[in-house]
């Protein structure tokens, strides 16, 4: 079974985001819901950003829950969001309309497909 390897699930609110993520930092996130029967987090969208706090606040009201993890570098965040995107169904199952983009001015490859070959 695929794993996000993230902390949470937390309520997606400005208050909770500020409580958990107190400074601008690189990382990954997943947005979703809690399944009523299983009580498990259901991934609906995955992303990454260099400022998790600000980015997550842009999603408040779109999904009720979020998970997150810090990344050691931009490249690590990119590789993780690609893995999460593929592991959780890509555009067929997630709200992501496109494969995650790599940062400008990089030649990084997706670790799961040949999108950038």
Task: Annotate each PLM feature.
Residues 1-44, 48-117:
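Boundary/linker segments flanking structured domains
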């Amino acid at each position: 079974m695929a794993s996000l390897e993230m902390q949470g699930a937390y309520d997606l609110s400005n208050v909770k985001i500020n409580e958990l993520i107190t400074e601008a930092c690189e990382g990954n996130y997943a947005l979703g819901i809690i399944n009523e029967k299983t009580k498990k987090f259901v991934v609906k969208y995955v992303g990454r950003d260099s400022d998790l706090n600000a980015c997550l606040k842009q999603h408040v009201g779109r999904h009720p829950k979020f998970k997150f993890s810090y990344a050691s570098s931009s490249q690590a965040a990119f590789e993780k969001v690609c893995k999460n995107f593929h592991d959780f169904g890509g555009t067929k199952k997630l709200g992501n309309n496109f494969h995650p983009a790599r940062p400008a001015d990089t030649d990084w490859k997706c670790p799961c497909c040949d999108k950038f070959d």
